[in-house]
């Protein structure tokens, strides 16, 4: 609901609902959105399917746990894209347990979310050396511009929500990998180097205990993936 409420009233909204069992679809329809129900086929496939349904010249891709701040809404309303700009990178701030994370591995984040519909391609980026398509980025042939405002990403309101997503994503990535003891050993070594890098060099400590926790958990992520893949081998 927060995500839809943040969208400008004049925008045409398309919601692709992966057969949710809560009130997501009905709430979206009440707010005037076009709702298309489509069986879940993975993150990348779902985004590509959604883009294929768009008939406007520009698309703003918004996840259910994201919302636009007031500055971004004003900037979008006044935007007049030059002909050579095919997309805009949107600064994004992720919240963890109620506070914004401004440093560390989550600090510098500005994904491409606004783009010319017919010029954008979604590129899958398998993580941790596996084949699972969990991460992606929008690619365009032209220039990528910048815009004022912030995309608010409130995906982890509690430790439980973070832990659940961490467990889910690492399991999905491990399922697309061939595990081995050498791969696990390399992942452990990399994790030991990344933790202080995220904490000190990337200034994760500036975010307090949240930054310290995320520095170590982010560093451990590939190691957990490798461990789960090794257990499956």
Where in the sequence are the language-model features?
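Acidic helix N-cap motif at the loop->helix transition within catalytic regions
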Residues: 1, 22-31, 71-72
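Short, well-formed alpha-helical segments that are part of the catalytic scaffolds
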Residues: 1-9
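A conserved acidic beta->alpha catalytic loop
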Residues: 6, 17-27, 63
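Short, structured coil segments at secondary-structure junctions
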Residues: 9, 31-32, 55, 140
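Conserved donor nucleotide-binding strand/loop of the catalytic core
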Residues: 25-53
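Cofactor-binding loops of NAD(P)H-dependent oxidoreductases
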Residues: 38, 62-64
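Catalytic-site signature of metal-activated, phosphate-bearing donor transferases
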Residues: 45-51, 58, 62, 69-233
């Amino acid at each position: 609901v927060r995500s839809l409420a943040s969208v400008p009233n004049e925008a045409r909204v398309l919601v692709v609902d992966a057969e949710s069992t809560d009130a997501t679809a009905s709430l979206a329809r009440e707010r005037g959105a076009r709702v298309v129900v489509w069986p879940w086929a993975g993150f990348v496939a779902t985004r590509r399917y959604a883009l294929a349904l768009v008939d406007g010249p520009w698309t703003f891709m918004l996840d259910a746990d994201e919302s636009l701040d007031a500055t971004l809404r004003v900037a979008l309303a006044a935007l007049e894209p030059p002909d050579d700009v095919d997309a805009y990178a949107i600064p994004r701030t992720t919240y963890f347990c109620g506070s914004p994370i401004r440093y560390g591995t989550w600090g510098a984040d500005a994904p491409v979310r606004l783009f010319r519909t017919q010029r954008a391609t979604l590129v899958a980026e398998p993580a941790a050396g596996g084949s699972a398509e969990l991460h992606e980025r929008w690619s365009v042939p032209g220039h990528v511009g910048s815009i004022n405002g912030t995309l608010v990403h409130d995906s982890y309101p509690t430790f439980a929500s973070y832990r659940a997503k961490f467990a889910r994503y690492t399991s999905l990535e491990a399922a697309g990998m061939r595990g081995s003891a050498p791969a696990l050993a390399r992942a452990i070594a990399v994790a030991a180097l990344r933790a202080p890098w995220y904490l000190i060099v990337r200034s994760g400590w500036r975010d307090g205990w949240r930054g310290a926790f995320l520095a170590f958990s982010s560093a451990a992520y590939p190691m957990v993936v490798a461990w789960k893949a090794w257990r499956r081998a």
